[in-house]
A protein has these predicted regions:
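N-terminal amphipathic, basic-rich helices that act as targeting or association modules
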Residues: 1-83, 206-207, 215-221, 234, ...
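Glycine/charged-rich beta-loop-alpha catalytic/anionic-binding loops adjacent to active sites
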Residues: 31-38, 99-114, 136-142, 316-330, ...
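Active-site nucleophile and cofactor-binding loops and adjacent substrate-binding regions
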Residues: 41-50, 70-74, 102-123, 145-149, ...
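Cofactor-binding active-site loop characterized by glycine-rich and histidine/acidic residues
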Residues: 43-165, 284, 302, 307, ...
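Non-catalytic terminal/interface segments that mediate subunit docking, oligomerization
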Residues: 67, 250-359, 365-375, 457, ...
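A glycine-rich helix N-cap at a beta->alpha junction
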Residues: 87-98, 164-178, 371-383
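Glycine-rich ThDP/TPP pyrophosphate-binding loop and its adjacent helix/strand module
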Residues: 110-281, 285-290, 409-518
């Protein structure tokens, strides 16, 4: 049987198919996604779960004139394949290839760039209001949002506004009861009751003055198309509740939805994971997870908080053993931080684990609710620095810059697993101020990291290597590349290496000693060069009237796209070879 998918280069070809051909197309699209992701890796389960919905949306609506927004974008692979990127899909998330998320500059079909959760309703509403103002009353605006994302505050803000407008917006709830981890909270239970048919009255969407329909089976393509055609004729804000299964069509992905969200390589035929050679090193997230559990067993005041990332943060270890003291609050970063602040006022010791890129979503809470009140919340910022294939929306390269200007906040970047473990130990002993601890995705550098705890003196850096006429100052785990680069440069004996550890407070005594001894200083960080660690050193040198040459190296003032961490480091000059070349040039 000839493949239908081979002849679809845009939704124009899709709409020429008879409706009874669409189940075959759905199977082909699933197979295509599975076969590519099996070898190239990526987000699997979410895209498999919306194959029928994706086809139906492009079949019924006149995209790209009608505007379609995918919340987060994990589920948009089918959308990309049907909108002219089938032949490029094998480059997904690879350096120079297509993005794993919708991007406006990649395709006219990507109406809004996404990557973070809960933005789709507000964006679609903005577009719908703009169309109203232009007099384009027939244009359709569709936001597809998951049950985990819709529980976020921003999604509710969008719904609240939509309900008092006459804007032509359709909100589709893709309800599969899971985000990356299982959905949580009262809204999740409400949606479960709706699916069971025991929540007929007091519909929360209708109460917001939005036309509600559903729930319907999101894998019954005829039913989905029929309902979309009906809703196309309904004016004003509309809400369609669609029930789907994450991982649909691949048995293992349906049964193990957390693992198969982004499973890595697997056998496309059997679905079995292709296991990687086990690393002798431990992931930083697991160092955090094991350490907080160990500390919590010794200190009854410790609590753990994560906004929807119990697996990714490894807080799940504490949640499994101490569920009453570890909290997954859902996609609710603002709430997570102020919850931690409230706990801190009552003598608890909250470890709030948030990916660096997601802390951006709760900046006011860090300032207003924590730092201003000097509440000793312990922020553990996972995925700091370059994260790799998820690209610009997920790199954690701004935290040093946006946190450094906040009074009363300690900022620490561990060089290795032992340092991470010891700063967590030090923080729970009782700091008088909040602290942000940033560490990267991936594995560490120390096999035997589980050493007895020792305290770290706040605001003190360390010298790792002596040198004659040049000093490299690094912060965090980039010290590994720096150490190797010094060893490989032409005159390693000339180059000293310092791990400053704290961006705030800076070790001013050590900086005075360095600036008095070395004429040339190089700062190296995996944060933006604008306002980060290097900027702090430059400010210190200027305020104290030093005239040394200070070279700042880090993430350039551009958004870094996707690729492996090693590839991206090489592109921006943070790999070992590039740092060695810089040392040779300046030495």
């Amino acid at each position: 049987m000839p493949k239908l998918l081979d002849h679809i280069n845009s939704p124009l070809e899709l709409r020429k198919l008879s409706q009874d051909c669409l189940p075959q197309l759905a199977q082909e699209l699933r197979d295509f996604i599975i076969n590519i992701v099996a070898t190239k890796e990526g987000h699997l389960g979410a895209s498999l779960g919306v194959v029928e919905l994706t086809i139906a949306l492009h079949y019924v609506f006149n995209t790209p004139e009608d505007q379609l927004i995918w919340d987060v974008g994990h589920q948009a692979y089918g959308h990309k394949i049907l909108t002219g990127r089938r032949n490029d899909f094998h480059t997904n998330r690879q350096i120079g290839g297509i993005s794993g998320f919708p991007k406006r500059d990649e395709s006219v079909y990507d109406a809004f760039g996404v990557g973070h959760a809960s933005t789709s309703i507000s964006a679609a509403l903005g577009m719908a209001i703009a169309s109203q103002l232009k007099g384009d009353t027939e244009k359709q605006h569709i936001a597809v949002i998951g049950d985990a994302s819709i529980a976020s505050g921003m999604a509710f803000e969008g719904l609240n506004h939509a309900g008092v407008t006459s804007a032509n917006i359709l909100i589709i709830l893709n309800d599969n009861a899971i985000g990356i981890d299982p959905s949580v909270g009262a809204l999740k239970q409400y949606l479960t009751n709706v699916k069971k048919g025991i929540q007929r009255k007091n519909n929360i969407i209708k109460a917001l003055n939005i036309d509600y329909s559903g729930p319907i089976d999101g894998h019954d393509i005829d039913k989905v198309i029929s309902e979309l055609k009906r809703l196309k004729t309904v004016k004003g804000p509309k809400f369609l509740h669609v029930i789907t299964t994450k991982g649909k069509g691949l048995k293992q992905a349906e049964e193990n939805q957390v693992t198969y969200h982004a499973p890595g390589k697997f056998n496309a035929f059997t679905g079995d994971l292709i296991l990687k050679t086990p690393s002798e090193f431990t992931k930083y997230q697991d160092v955090f997870g094991y350490t907080i559990l160990e500390l919590a067993k010794q200190n009854k005041h410790i609590v753990g908080i994560t906004p929807a990332m119990p697996t990714g943060s490894s807080l799940k270890y504490m949640m499994d053993e101490m569920p009453e003291r570890a909290f997954d609050v859902g996609i609710a970063e603002q709430h997570a931080i102020t919850l931690a602040a409230g706990m801190a006022t009552q003598g608890l010791i909250p470890f709030c684990n948030i990916y660096s890129t997601f802390l951006q979503r709760a900046y006011d809470q860090v300032i207003h609710d924590v730092a201003l009140q000097k509440l000793p919340v312990i922020f553990c910022l996972d995925r700091a620095g370059l994260v790799g294939e998820d690209g610009a929306t997920h790199h954690g390269v701004f935290d040093l810059s946006y946190l450094r200007c906040i009074p009363n906040l300690i900022i620490f970047a561990p060089r290795n697993e032992i340092e991470l473990r010891n700063i967590m130990f030090t923080a729970q002993l009782g700091l008088q101020l909040p602290i942000a601890i940033r560490y990267p995705r991936g594995t560490g550098v120390t096999v035997d990291w589980k050493q007895p705890f020792s305290t770290i003196e706040i605001g003190k850096g360390v010298q790792l290597k002596e040198g004659i006429n040049m000093a490299v100052l690094s912060i965090g785990t980039i010290a590994k590349n720096v150490g190797a680069a010094i060893a490989n440069c032409n005159y390693p004996e000339n180059v000293a290496h310092y791990d400053m550890r704290f961006v705030k407070p800076l070790d001013e005594a050590l900086l005075h000693a360095i600036l008095n001894k070395y004429e040339t200083i190089i700062t190296i960080e995996d944060n933006s060069v604008k306002g980060g660690f290097g900027s702090a050193v430059l400010e210190f040198a200027s305020v104290n009237d030093y005239r040394n040459t200070v070279k700042v190296s880090g993430i350039p003032d551009v958004f870094i796209e996707h690729g492996s961490v090693n590839e991206l480091q090489k592109t921006i000059g943070l790999d070992v070879e590039s740092i060695s070349e810089l040392l040779n040039k300046l030495n």
